[in-house]
Each structure stands twice: as structure tokens, then as C-alpha cells.
Amino acid sequence: MAMTNEEKVLAIREKLNIVNQGLLDPEKYKNANEEQLTDIYDFVQSRERLSPSEVTAIADALGQLRHD
């Protein structure tokens, strides 16, 4: 069974170890572009560790997909 956008965001949020988890509210990604979100999810999951610049870039990309 495929993951929902919300499940992907939860997994990304956990992997990024975001202190303020409210910044990545899964509810705000329900209608996000699924392909773009999947690309971000796949990248994050493929990495054992993420550099600070990668975390920043991922957070920026997620911010562009969010629907407030």
C-alpha cells in the first residue's frame, strides 16, 4: 500500500530531527504535489545522514509544497 502525503511528511520530519515539529504539519501537505513530495521522501530515506545544508534545502523545498 502506498504511503499518503501525510505519512511521508511524518517520516521526513522524523529523519530530519526537526526540533519544532509544528513546522512540518502533515495536514498542510494533504494536497501537495505527490510526485515532488515522493522525490523528497526518497532522497531523505536514501541518506544515512543529512548535512545541515541538505536539511535547510529540504525544509525550503517542503515549505514550497505546503498548503496553508
From Swiss-Prot:
Query: Superkingdom, according to UniProt?
Result: Bacteria
Q: What is the name attached to this protein's record?
A: UPF0435 protein SAB1812c
What is the species listed in this Swiss-Prot or TrEMBL entry? Answer: Staphylococcus aureus (strain bovine RF122 / ET3-1)
Q: Which family does it belong to?
A: Belongs to the UPF0435 family.
Which Pfam family would be a valid example here? DUF1128
